[in-house]
Protein backbone atom coordinates (compact mmCIF):
# COMPACT_ATOMS: atom_id res chain seq x y z
CA UNK A 1 0.00 0.00 0.00
CA UNK A 2 1.42 3.34 -0.95
CA UNK A 3 0.94 6.48 1.08
CA UNK A 4 -1.23 8.05 -1.58
CA UNK A 5 -3.90 5.58 -0.63
CA UNK A 6 -4.69 4.31 -4.15
CA UNK A 7 -5.86 0.72 -4.36
CA UNK A 8 -5.68 -1.27 -7.55
CA UNK A 9 -8.50 -3.63 -6.52
CA UNK A 10 -10.67 -1.51 -4.34
CA UNK A 11 -12.41 -3.57 -1.61
CA UNK A 12 -15.85 -2.67 -0.31
CA UNK A 13 -15.73 0.48 1.79
CA UNK A 14 -15.50 -0.28 5.52
CA UNK A 15 -18.56 0.55 7.60
CA UNK A 16 -18.79 4.18 8.59
CA UNK A 17 -19.99 5.23 12.04
CA UNK A 18 -23.19 7.08 11.18
CA UNK A 19 -23.81 8.84 14.45
CA UNK A 20 -22.39 9.21 17.90
CA UNK A 21 -23.98 7.74 20.98
CA UNK A 22 -23.18 10.95 22.81
CA UNK A 23 -26.16 13.01 23.92
CA UNK A 24 -26.11 16.38 25.58
CA UNK A 25 -27.06 16.45 29.23
CA UNK A 26 -29.09 19.52 28.50
CA UNK A 27 -28.12 21.11 31.77
CA UNK A 28 -26.83 24.59 32.40
CA UNK A 29 -23.67 23.30 34.02
CA UNK A 30 -20.64 24.76 32.28
CA UNK A 31 -18.86 21.49 32.99
CA UNK A 32 -21.49 19.37 31.31
CA UNK A 33 -20.73 17.68 28.03
CA UNK A 34 -22.02 19.74 25.14
CA UNK A 35 -22.11 17.42 22.19
CA UNK A 36 -23.85 17.38 18.86
CA UNK A 37 -25.09 14.18 17.29
CA UNK A 38 -22.12 14.12 14.93
CA UNK A 39 -19.20 11.82 15.73
CA UNK A 40 -17.02 14.87 16.27
CA UNK A 41 -18.49 18.08 17.72
CA UNK A 42 -18.31 21.46 16.08
CA UNK A 43 -15.58 23.89 16.96
CA UNK A 44 -15.98 24.75 20.66
CA UNK A 45 -17.60 28.05 21.50
CA UNK A 46 -15.45 30.83 22.85
CA UNK A 47 -14.78 30.13 26.50
CA UNK A 48 -16.31 32.53 29.02
CA UNK A 49 -14.30 33.56 32.08
CA UNK A 50 -14.85 31.23 34.99
CA UNK A 51 -14.82 31.96 38.65
CA UNK A 52 -11.67 30.80 40.33
CA UNK A 53 -12.07 27.59 42.31
CA UNK A 54 -10.76 27.79 45.85
CA UNK A 55 -7.71 25.60 46.23
CA UNK A 56 -7.33 23.19 49.10
CA UNK A 57 -3.58 23.31 48.63
CA UNK A 58 -1.20 25.99 49.77
CA UNK A 59 1.59 25.51 47.26
CA UNK A 60 2.15 25.05 43.58
CA UNK A 61 3.59 22.27 41.55
CA UNK A 62 7.35 22.04 41.76
CA UNK A 63 9.87 21.14 39.13
CA UNK A 64 12.50 18.53 39.81
CA UNK A 65 16.17 18.78 38.96
CA UNK A 66 17.35 16.29 36.40
CA UNK A 67 20.50 14.20 36.77
CA UNK A 68 23.19 14.39 34.12
CA UNK A 69 23.35 11.48 31.67
CA UNK A 70 20.37 9.72 33.27
CA UNK A 71 16.73 9.40 32.43
CA UNK A 72 15.14 11.85 34.87
CA UNK A 73 13.51 10.29 37.89
CA UNK A 74 10.36 11.81 39.30
CA UNK A 75 11.23 12.52 42.89
CA UNK A 76 9.14 11.43 45.87
CA UNK A 77 6.59 14.06 46.92
CA UNK A 78 7.95 16.83 49.11
CA UNK A 79 5.04 19.30 49.10
CA UNK A 80 3.50 18.95 52.54
CA UNK A 81 0.18 20.71 52.23
CA UNK A 82 -2.42 21.98 54.67
CA UNK A 83 -5.91 21.13 53.45
CA UNK A 84 -9.41 22.33 54.16
CA UNK A 85 -11.36 19.83 56.24
CA UNK A 86 -14.74 18.91 54.78
CA UNK A 87 -17.11 16.75 56.79
CA UNK A 88 -20.24 14.77 55.91
CA UNK A 89 -23.35 14.50 58.06
CA UNK A 90 -24.76 11.01 57.48
CA UNK A 91 -28.08 12.02 59.05
CA UNK A 92 -28.80 15.05 56.88
CA UNK A 93 -26.81 13.81 53.90
CA UNK A 94 -25.05 17.17 53.67
CA UNK A 95 -21.38 18.12 53.52
CA UNK A 96 -20.04 20.54 56.12
CA UNK A 97 -17.22 23.02 55.72
CA UNK A 98 -17.27 22.74 51.94
CA UNK A 99 -15.92 25.74 49.99
CA UNK A 100 -18.64 27.62 48.17
CA UNK A 101 -17.19 26.90 44.74
CA UNK A 102 -17.09 23.19 45.49
CA UNK A 103 -20.72 23.34 46.58
CA UNK A 104 -21.65 24.97 43.27
CA UNK A 105 -19.77 22.33 41.31
CA UNK A 106 -21.52 19.60 43.25
CA UNK A 107 -24.95 21.14 42.64
CA UNK A 108 -24.44 21.03 38.88
CA UNK A 109 -22.57 17.71 38.75
CA UNK A 110 -25.65 15.47 38.41
CA UNK A 111 -24.32 13.38 41.31
CA UNK A 112 -27.52 12.52 43.16
CA UNK A 113 -28.04 12.94 46.90
CA UNK A 114 -28.26 9.16 47.19
CA UNK A 115 -24.91 8.78 45.43
CA UNK A 116 -23.38 11.42 47.67
CA UNK A 117 -24.61 9.64 50.76
CA UNK A 118 -23.48 6.26 49.44
CA UNK A 119 -19.88 7.34 48.94
CA UNK A 120 -19.07 10.85 50.20
CA UNK A 121 -15.33 10.22 50.02
CA UNK A 122 -15.53 9.56 46.28
CA UNK A 123 -17.41 12.85 45.90
CA UNK A 124 -14.62 14.70 47.68
CA UNK A 125 -12.01 12.90 45.58
CA UNK A 126 -13.53 14.12 42.33
CA UNK A 127 -14.04 17.64 43.67
CA UNK A 128 -10.36 17.79 44.58
CA UNK A 129 -9.68 16.70 41.02
CA UNK A 130 -11.17 19.96 39.81
CA UNK A 131 -9.30 22.17 42.24
CA UNK A 132 -8.05 25.13 40.24
CA UNK A 133 -4.52 25.00 41.53
CA UNK A 134 -4.06 21.27 41.04
CA UNK A 135 -5.31 20.89 37.49
CA UNK A 136 -2.54 21.41 34.98
CA UNK A 137 -2.54 20.85 31.26
CA UNK A 138 0.02 18.69 29.60
CA UNK A 139 3.05 20.76 28.77
CA UNK A 140 4.33 19.12 25.61
CA UNK A 141 1.29 18.56 23.42
CA UNK A 142 1.10 21.06 20.63
CA UNK A 143 -1.68 23.63 20.77
CA UNK A 144 -3.46 24.11 17.46
CA UNK A 145 -5.47 27.29 16.93
CA UNK A 146 -9.01 27.11 15.65
CA UNK A 147 -8.07 27.78 12.04
CA UNK A 148 -4.93 25.70 11.75
CA UNK A 149 -5.24 22.02 12.53
CA UNK A 150 -2.28 19.70 12.80
CA UNK A 151 -2.19 16.38 11.07
CA UNK A 152 -2.48 13.60 13.55
CA UNK A 153 0.65 12.11 12.06
CA UNK A 154 2.64 14.80 13.83
CA UNK A 155 3.43 13.54 17.33
CA UNK A 156 2.08 15.66 20.15
CA UNK A 157 4.42 18.23 21.59
CA UNK A 158 2.77 20.89 23.73
CA UNK A 159 3.97 24.43 23.35
CA UNK A 160 1.57 26.27 25.60
CA UNK A 161 0.31 25.98 29.13
CA UNK A 162 -2.61 28.10 30.15
CA UNK A 163 -2.32 29.59 33.62
CA UNK A 164 -6.07 30.08 33.66
CA UNK A 165 -7.99 28.27 36.37
CA UNK A 166 -9.43 25.21 34.71
CA UNK A 167 -11.57 22.19 35.18
CA UNK A 168 -10.77 19.82 32.35
CA UNK A 169 -11.08 22.47 29.68
CA UNK A 170 -8.44 25.12 29.13
CA UNK A 171 -8.79 28.35 27.24
CA UNK A 172 -6.13 27.76 24.63
CA UNK A 173 -5.00 24.21 24.70
CA UNK A 174 -5.99 21.23 22.66
CA UNK A 175 -3.88 18.11 22.75
CA UNK A 176 -6.12 16.40 20.25
CA UNK A 177 -4.50 16.49 16.84
CA UNK A 178 -6.50 16.82 13.64
CA UNK A 179 -5.61 15.24 10.30
CA UNK A 180 -6.01 17.20 7.08
CA UNK A 181 -8.64 18.15 6.20
CA UNK A 182 -9.05 20.09 9.43
CA UNK A 183 -11.75 18.65 11.66
CA UNK A 184 -13.33 19.88 14.85
CA UNK A 185 -11.62 18.65 18.02
CA UNK A 186 -13.24 16.36 20.52
CA UNK A 187 -14.99 17.87 23.55
CA UNK A 188 -12.69 19.85 25.83
CA UNK A 189 -13.34 17.52 28.76
CA UNK A 190 -11.62 14.65 26.94
CA UNK A 191 -8.29 16.45 27.18
CA UNK A 192 -5.40 15.22 29.27
CA UNK A 193 -4.84 16.77 32.67
CA UNK A 194 -2.29 16.67 35.44
CA UNK A 195 -2.82 17.14 39.16
CA UNK A 196 -0.26 17.16 41.89
CA UNK A 197 0.55 14.20 44.06
CA UNK A 198 -1.51 13.58 47.17
CA UNK A 199 0.55 10.69 48.46
CA UNK A 200 1.41 10.80 52.14
CA UNK A 201 4.54 12.94 52.46
CA UNK A 202 7.87 11.45 53.41
CA UNK A 203 8.14 11.66 57.22
CA UNK A 204 9.59 15.00 58.22
CA UNK A 205 12.41 15.33 60.78
CA UNK A 206 11.41 15.25 64.44
CA UNK A 207 9.89 18.56 65.42
CA UNK A 208 8.67 19.30 61.89
CA UNK A 209 5.98 16.66 61.57
CA UNK A 210 2.99 19.00 61.83
CA UNK A 211 1.32 19.61 58.51
CA UNK A 212 1.71 23.40 58.73
CA UNK A 213 5.43 23.22 59.43
CA UNK A 214 5.61 20.72 56.61
CA UNK A 215 4.22 23.35 54.29
CA UNK A 216 7.10 25.63 55.27
CA UNK A 217 9.66 22.93 54.59
CA UNK A 218 7.95 22.47 51.23
CA UNK A 219 8.88 26.03 50.29
CA UNK A 220 12.49 25.34 51.20
CA UNK A 221 12.45 22.18 49.11
CA UNK A 222 11.11 24.06 46.13
CA UNK A 223 13.91 26.60 46.35
CA UNK A 224 16.45 23.80 46.42
CA UNK A 225 15.03 21.72 43.58
CA UNK A 226 13.56 24.29 41.17
CA UNK A 227 15.72 24.65 38.08
CA UNK A 228 16.36 28.19 36.94
CA UNK A 229 15.81 29.16 33.31
CA UNK A 230 19.56 29.36 32.79
CA UNK A 231 20.09 25.89 34.28
CA UNK A 232 17.37 24.54 32.01
CA UNK A 233 18.90 26.13 28.92
CA UNK A 234 22.32 24.80 29.91
CA UNK A 235 20.86 21.32 30.34
CA UNK A 236 19.13 21.54 26.97
CA UNK A 237 22.43 22.46 25.31
CA UNK A 238 23.92 19.20 26.60
CA UNK A 239 21.19 17.00 25.12
CA UNK A 240 20.45 18.60 21.73
CA UNK A 241 22.47 18.17 18.56
CA UNK A 242 24.78 20.87 17.25
CA UNK A 243 23.83 22.40 13.94
CA UNK A 244 21.16 24.27 12.03
CA UNK A 245 18.03 22.18 11.35
CA UNK A 246 17.21 24.45 8.41
CA UNK A 247 20.27 23.03 6.65
CA UNK A 248 19.70 19.38 7.60
CA UNK A 249 16.04 19.36 6.56
CA UNK A 250 14.43 20.84 3.48
CA UNK A 251 10.97 21.29 1.92
CA UNK A 252 9.54 22.78 5.09
CA UNK A 253 5.78 22.88 4.89
CA UNK A 254 3.88 24.57 7.69
CA UNK A 255 1.01 22.41 8.85
CA UNK A 256 0.06 24.21 12.04
CA UNK A 257 0.56 27.30 14.15
CA UNK A 258 0.25 27.36 17.92
CA UNK A 259 0.38 30.21 20.41
CA UNK A 260 4.10 29.69 20.99
CA UNK A 261 5.34 27.46 18.21
CA UNK A 262 4.94 26.03 14.74
CA UNK A 263 4.75 22.51 13.30
CA UNK A 264 6.21 21.60 9.92
CA UNK A 265 6.68 18.57 7.78
CA UNK A 266 10.12 18.49 6.21
CA UNK A 267 12.47 16.15 4.39
CA UNK A 268 15.78 14.89 5.74
CA UNK A 269 18.34 16.00 3.13
CA UNK A 270 20.61 13.01 3.70
CA UNK A 271 17.96 10.29 3.94
CA UNK A 272 15.06 11.69 1.95
CA UNK A 273 12.79 10.80 4.89
CA UNK A 274 9.69 12.86 5.69
CA UNK A 275 9.63 14.05 9.29
CA UNK A 276 7.58 16.21 11.62
CA UNK A 277 9.41 19.18 13.16
CA UNK A 278 8.19 21.22 16.10
CA UNK A 279 9.67 24.68 16.48
CA UNK A 280 9.09 25.76 20.08
CA UNK A 281 9.64 29.22 21.51
CA UNK A 282 11.11 28.47 24.92
CA UNK A 283 10.42 31.98 26.17
CA UNK A 284 6.73 31.11 26.09
CA UNK A 285 7.15 27.85 28.04
CA UNK A 286 6.42 28.23 31.77
CA UNK A 287 7.49 24.63 32.53
CA UNK A 288 10.70 24.26 30.55
CA UNK A 289 12.05 21.52 32.82
CA UNK A 290 9.27 19.19 31.67
CA UNK A 291 10.47 19.58 28.09
CA UNK A 292 13.82 18.19 29.19
CA UNK A 293 12.06 15.28 30.86
CA UNK A 294 10.14 14.30 27.75
CA UNK A 295 13.07 14.70 25.37
CA UNK A 296 15.33 12.54 27.54
CA UNK A 297 12.67 9.86 27.87
CA UNK A 298 11.87 9.88 24.14
CA UNK A 299 15.54 9.67 23.19
CA UNK A 300 15.94 6.52 25.26
CA UNK A 301 12.70 4.75 24.32
CA UNK A 302 13.31 3.15 20.95
CA UNK A 303 10.71 0.59 19.94
CA UNK A 304 8.81 -0.29 16.73
CA UNK A 305 5.53 0.51 18.47
CA UNK A 306 6.57 3.93 19.76
CA UNK A 307 6.69 7.08 17.62
CA UNK A 308 10.37 7.60 17.00
CA UNK A 309 12.20 10.65 18.33
CA UNK A 310 14.80 11.55 15.71
CA UNK A 311 16.72 14.63 16.82
CA UNK A 312 16.57 18.01 18.52
CA UNK A 313 18.31 21.34 18.02
CA UNK A 314 18.56 24.57 19.98
CA UNK A 315 18.92 27.79 18.00
CA UNK A 316 18.81 30.77 20.34
CA UNK A 317 15.56 30.44 22.28
CA UNK A 318 14.00 28.21 19.63
CA UNK A 319 13.91 24.45 20.24
CA UNK A 320 13.46 22.21 17.19
CA UNK A 321 12.24 18.68 17.92
CA UNK A 322 12.33 16.24 15.00
CA UNK A 323 9.97 13.26 15.17
CA UNK A 324 8.78 10.44 12.97
CA UNK A 325 5.80 11.44 10.84
CA UNK A 326 2.86 9.04 10.44
CA UNK A 327 0.52 10.01 7.64
CA UNK A 328 -2.36 7.78 8.73
CA UNK A 329 -3.45 10.05 11.54
CA UNK A 330 -4.64 9.20 15.01
CA UNK A 331 -6.70 6.19 16.03
CA UNK A 332 -9.34 8.68 17.17
CA UNK A 333 -10.13 9.50 13.55
CA UNK A 334 -10.76 5.82 12.84
CA UNK A 335 -12.84 5.04 15.94
CA UNK A 336 -15.09 8.08 15.52
CA UNK A 337 -15.60 7.79 11.76
CA UNK A 338 -15.61 4.05 11.03
CA UNK A 339 -16.60 0.74 12.61
CA UNK A 340 -13.81 -1.68 13.47
CA UNK A 341 -14.31 -5.42 13.66
CA UNK A 342 -12.89 -7.52 16.50
CA UNK A 343 -9.93 -8.76 14.47
CA UNK A 344 -8.88 -5.19 13.68
CA UNK A 345 -9.32 -4.21 17.33
CA UNK A 346 -7.19 -7.19 18.33
CA UNK A 347 -4.44 -6.03 15.97
CA UNK A 348 -4.38 -2.54 17.51
CA UNK A 349 -4.47 -3.93 21.06
CA UNK A 350 -1.57 -6.27 20.31
CA UNK A 351 0.61 -3.46 18.97
CA UNK A 352 -0.20 -1.21 21.93
CA UNK A 353 0.50 -4.01 24.41
CA UNK A 354 3.87 -4.58 22.77
CA UNK A 355 4.67 -0.91 23.37
CA UNK A 356 3.44 -1.10 26.96
CA UNK A 357 5.41 -4.26 27.69
CA UNK A 358 8.53 -2.41 26.54
CA UNK A 359 7.74 0.71 28.57
CA UNK A 360 6.89 -1.20 31.74
CA UNK A 361 10.01 -3.35 31.43
CA UNK A 362 11.92 -0.07 31.43
CA UNK A 363 10.06 1.13 34.54
CA UNK A 364 8.09 3.74 32.62
CA UNK A 365 4.33 4.30 32.96
CA UNK A 366 2.74 6.15 30.04
CA UNK A 367 -0.28 7.36 32.08
CA UNK A 368 -2.28 8.74 29.15
CA UNK A 369 -3.26 5.82 26.93
CA UNK A 370 -6.20 6.73 24.67
CA UNK A 371 -6.96 6.71 20.96
CA UNK A 372 -5.68 10.27 20.55
CA UNK A 373 -2.21 9.10 21.56
CA UNK A 374 -2.06 6.19 19.11
CA UNK A 375 -0.82 7.13 15.64
CA UNK A 376 -1.22 5.08 12.48
CA UNK A 377 0.92 4.71 9.40
CA UNK A 378 -0.83 4.42 6.05
CA UNK A 379 0.35 0.82 5.84
CA UNK A 380 -1.33 0.11 9.18
CA UNK A 381 1.54 0.48 11.65
CA UNK A 382 0.39 1.34 15.18
CA UNK A 383 2.53 3.49 17.49
CA UNK A 384 2.15 5.14 20.89
CA UNK A 385 3.01 8.80 21.17
CA UNK A 386 2.89 11.67 23.66
CA UNK A 387 5.14 11.02 26.64
CA UNK A 388 4.45 14.32 28.37
CA UNK A 389 2.81 12.45 31.24
CA UNK A 390 5.10 9.45 31.50
CA UNK A 391 6.59 8.62 34.89
CA UNK A 392 9.54 6.51 35.88
CA UNK A 393 9.17 4.15 38.79
CA UNK A 394 12.19 3.30 40.90
CA UNK A 395 12.95 0.68 43.58
CA UNK A 396 12.52 3.43 46.17
CA UNK A 397 9.20 4.53 44.72
CA UNK A 398 7.47 1.69 42.92
CA UNK A 399 4.08 3.41 42.98
CA UNK A 400 2.85 6.81 41.83
CA UNK A 401 -0.07 8.79 43.22
CA UNK A 402 -0.36 11.86 41.03
CA UNK A 403 -3.72 12.16 39.28
CA UNK A 404 -2.64 12.16 35.67
CA UNK A 405 -4.23 11.28 32.36
CA UNK A 406 -7.61 11.91 30.81
CA UNK A 407 -10.67 11.46 33.06
CA UNK A 408 -12.68 8.99 30.99
CA UNK A 409 -9.70 6.67 30.50
CA UNK A 410 -8.46 6.85 34.10
CA UNK A 411 -8.16 3.76 36.27
CA UNK A 412 -10.20 3.76 39.51
CA UNK A 413 -7.05 3.76 41.63
CA UNK A 414 -5.99 7.02 39.95
CA UNK A 415 -9.37 8.70 40.43
CA UNK A 416 -9.49 7.68 44.10
CA UNK A 417 -5.93 8.93 44.54
CA UNK A 418 -4.39 5.68 45.64
CA UNK A 419 -0.82 4.67 44.91
CA UNK A 420 -0.65 3.01 41.50
CA UNK A 421 1.73 1.27 39.14
CA UNK A 422 2.04 0.28 35.46
CA UNK A 423 -1.34 -1.45 35.37
CA UNK A 424 -3.09 1.92 35.10
CA UNK A 425 -2.00 1.76 31.45
CA UNK A 426 -3.74 -1.61 31.10
CA UNK A 427 -7.02 -0.18 32.40
CA UNK A 428 -6.75 2.72 29.94
CA UNK A 429 -6.08 0.24 27.13
CA UNK A 430 -9.29 -1.58 28.08
CA UNK A 431 -11.21 1.69 27.90
CA UNK A 432 -9.60 2.38 24.52
CA UNK A 433 -10.77 -1.05 23.35
CA UNK A 434 -14.33 -0.05 24.30
CA UNK A 435 -13.70 3.18 22.41
CA UNK A 436 -12.89 1.11 19.32
CA UNK A 437 -16.18 -0.76 19.72
CA UNK A 438 -18.52 2.09 20.62
CA UNK A 439 -16.77 5.13 19.15
CA UNK A 440 -16.27 6.77 22.53
CA UNK A 441 -15.20 5.89 26.08
CA UNK A 442 -17.82 5.02 28.73
CA UNK A 443 -19.53 7.89 30.57
CA UNK A 444 -18.64 10.46 27.88
CA UNK A 445 -22.27 11.64 27.90
CA UNK A 446 -22.08 12.25 31.65
CA UNK A 447 -21.06 15.43 33.41
CA UNK A 448 -17.28 15.08 33.92
CA UNK A 449 -17.61 15.19 37.71
CA UNK A 450 -20.23 12.47 37.73
CA UNK A 451 -18.17 10.42 35.26
CA UNK A 452 -15.27 10.48 37.70
CA UNK A 453 -17.61 9.51 40.52
CA UNK A 454 -18.90 6.57 38.47
CA UNK A 455 -15.37 5.41 37.67
CA UNK A 456 -14.41 5.62 41.34
CA UNK A 457 -17.49 3.79 42.61
CA UNK A 458 -18.71 1.51 39.81
CA UNK A 459 -15.32 0.50 38.54
CA UNK A 460 -15.63 -1.69 35.46
CA UNK A 461 -17.99 0.08 33.03
CA UNK A 462 -20.87 -1.68 31.33
CA UNK A 463 -20.87 -2.15 27.58
CA UNK A 464 -23.77 -0.79 25.56
CA UNK A 465 -24.33 -4.08 23.70
CA UNK A 466 -22.20 -6.78 25.36
CA UNK A 467 -24.11 -9.54 23.58
CA UNK A 468 -22.63 -8.38 20.27
CA UNK A 469 -19.09 -9.15 21.42
CA UNK A 470 -17.52 -12.57 21.34
CA UNK A 471 -16.89 -14.30 24.70
CA UNK A 472 -13.14 -14.20 24.06
CA UNK A 473 -13.21 -10.42 23.52
CA UNK A 474 -15.33 -9.88 26.62
CA UNK A 475 -12.83 -11.92 28.61
CA UNK A 476 -9.98 -9.76 27.29
CA UNK A 477 -11.85 -6.62 28.35
CA UNK A 478 -12.52 -8.09 31.79
CA UNK A 479 -8.81 -8.82 32.23
CA UNK A 480 -7.96 -5.21 31.33
CA UNK A 481 -10.74 -3.66 33.39
CA UNK A 482 -10.35 -5.70 36.57
CA UNK A 483 -10.92 -3.48 39.63
CA UNK A 484 -8.49 -5.53 41.72
CA UNK A 485 -5.10 -4.36 40.47
CA UNK A 486 -3.45 -7.62 41.51
CA UNK A 487 -5.87 -9.58 39.31
CA UNK A 488 -5.64 -7.17 36.38
CA UNK A 489 -3.49 -8.52 33.59
CA UNK A 490 -0.02 -7.17 32.89
CA UNK A 491 1.09 -6.25 29.37
CA UNK A 492 3.22 -9.38 29.22
CA UNK A 493 0.34 -11.61 30.34
CA UNK A 494 -2.21 -10.05 28.01
CA UNK A 495 0.05 -10.51 25.01
CA UNK A 496 -0.63 -14.23 25.49
CA UNK A 497 -4.42 -13.77 25.60
CA UNK A 498 -6.31 -15.82 22.96
CA UNK A 499 -8.14 -12.70 21.75
CA UNK A 500 -4.94 -11.36 20.18
CA UNK A 501 -4.61 -14.51 18.11
CA UNK A 502 -7.66 -13.29 16.17
CA UNK A 503 -5.76 -10.24 14.94
CA UNK A 504 -5.86 -9.45 11.24
CA UNK A 505 -2.73 -8.21 9.43
CA UNK A 506 -2.01 -4.54 10.11
CA UNK A 507 -2.69 -3.80 6.44
CA UNK A 508 -6.37 -4.41 7.25
CA UNK A 509 -6.35 -1.01 8.99
CA UNK A 510 -5.52 0.85 5.78
CA UNK A 511 -9.09 0.85 4.38
CA UNK A 512 -10.32 2.20 7.73
CA UNK A 513 -7.74 5.00 7.68
CA UNK A 514 -8.73 5.96 4.14
CA UNK A 515 -12.44 5.79 4.96
CA UNK A 516 -11.91 8.02 8.01
CA UNK A 517 -10.10 10.61 5.90
CA UNK A 518 -12.90 10.57 3.32
CA UNK A 519 -15.55 10.90 6.03
CA UNK A 520 -13.74 13.85 7.58
CA UNK A 521 -13.40 15.49 4.19
CA UNK A 522 -17.15 15.24 3.64
CA UNK A 523 -17.80 16.60 7.15
CA UNK A 524 -16.02 19.87 6.41
Swiss-Prot record:
<dbReference type="InterPro" id="IPR011009">
    <property type="entry name" value="Kinase-like_dom_sf"/>
</dbReference>
<keyword id="KW-0808">Transferase</keyword>
<feature type="binding site">
    <location>
        <position position="278"/>
    </location>
    <ligand>
        <name>ATP</name>
    </ligand>
</feature>
<keyword id="KW-0723">Serine/threonine-protein kinase</keyword>
<dbReference type="InterPro" id="IPR033923">
    <property type="entry name" value="PAK_BD"/>
</dbReference>
<dbReference type="GO" id="GO:0004674">
    <property type="term" value="F:protein serine/threonine kinase activity"/>
</dbReference>
<feature type="modified residue" description="Phosphoserine">
    <location>
        <position position="55"/>
    </location>
</feature>
<feature type="modified residue" description="Phosphoserine">
    <location>
        <position position="197"/>
    </location>
</feature>
<keyword id="KW-0963">Cytoplasm</keyword>
<dbReference type="GO" id="GO:0150105">
    <property type="term" value="P:protein localization to cell-cell junction"/>
</dbReference>
<dbReference type="Pfam" id="PF00069">
    <property type="entry name" value="Pkinase"/>
</dbReference>
<comment type="subunit">
    <text>Interacts tightly with GTP-bound but not GDP-bound CDC42/p21 and RAC1. Interacts with SH3MD4. Interacts with SCRIB. Interacts with ARHGEF7 and GIT1. PAK-2p34 interacts with ARHGAP10. Interacts with RAC1.</text>
</comment>
<feature type="modified residue" description="Phosphoserine">
    <location>
        <position position="2"/>
    </location>
</feature>
<dbReference type="GO" id="GO:0048471">
    <property type="term" value="C:perinuclear region of cytoplasm"/>
</dbReference>
<dbReference type="GO" id="GO:0016020">
    <property type="term" value="C:membrane"/>
</dbReference>
<feature type="modified residue" description="Phosphothreonine">
    <location>
        <position position="159"/>
    </location>
</feature>
<feature type="domain" description="Protein kinase">
    <location>
        <begin position="249"/>
        <end position="500"/>
    </location>
</feature>
<dbReference type="GO" id="GO:0019901">
    <property type="term" value="F:protein kinase binding"/>
</dbReference>
<dbReference type="GO" id="GO:0005911">
    <property type="term" value="C:cell-cell junction"/>
</dbReference>
<feature type="modified residue" description="N-acetylserine">
    <location>
        <position position="2"/>
    </location>
</feature>
<keyword id="KW-0597">Phosphoprotein</keyword>
<dbReference type="GO" id="GO:0070830">
    <property type="term" value="P:bicellular tight junction assembly"/>
</dbReference>
<keyword id="KW-0547">Nucleotide-binding</keyword>
<dbReference type="InterPro" id="IPR035064">
    <property type="entry name" value="STK_PAK2"/>
</dbReference>
<dbReference type="GO" id="GO:0106310">
    <property type="term" value="F:protein serine kinase activity"/>
</dbReference>
<keyword id="KW-0539">Nucleus</keyword>
<feature type="modified residue" description="Phosphoserine">
    <location>
        <position position="152"/>
    </location>
</feature>
<feature type="domain" description="CRIB">
    <location>
        <begin position="74"/>
        <end position="87"/>
    </location>
</feature>
<feature type="region of interest" description="Disordered">
    <location>
        <begin position="1"/>
        <end position="81"/>
    </location>
</feature>
<dbReference type="GO" id="GO:0031267">
    <property type="term" value="F:small GTPase binding"/>
</dbReference>
<dbReference type="GO" id="GO:0005829">
    <property type="term" value="C:cytosol"/>
</dbReference>
<dbReference type="GO" id="GO:0005654">
    <property type="term" value="C:nucleoplasm"/>
</dbReference>
<feature type="compositionally biased region" description="Acidic residues">
    <location>
        <begin position="169"/>
        <end position="178"/>
    </location>
</feature>
<dbReference type="GO" id="GO:0034333">
    <property type="term" value="P:adherens junction assembly"/>
</dbReference>
<dbReference type="InterPro" id="IPR000095">
    <property type="entry name" value="CRIB_dom"/>
</dbReference>
<feature type="modified residue" description="Phosphothreonine">
    <location>
        <position position="60"/>
    </location>
</feature>
<dbReference type="GO" id="GO:0035556">
    <property type="term" value="P:intracellular signal transduction"/>
</dbReference>
<feature type="modified residue" description="Phosphoserine">
    <location>
        <position position="141"/>
    </location>
</feature>
<feature type="region of interest" description="Disordered">
    <location>
        <begin position="169"/>
        <end position="188"/>
    </location>
</feature>
<feature type="region of interest" description="Autoregulatory region">
    <location>
        <begin position="69"/>
        <end position="137"/>
    </location>
</feature>
<feature type="binding site">
    <location>
        <begin position="255"/>
        <end position="263"/>
    </location>
    <ligand>
        <name>ATP</name>
    </ligand>
</feature>
<feature type="modified residue" description="N6-acetyllysine">
    <location>
        <position position="62"/>
    </location>
</feature>
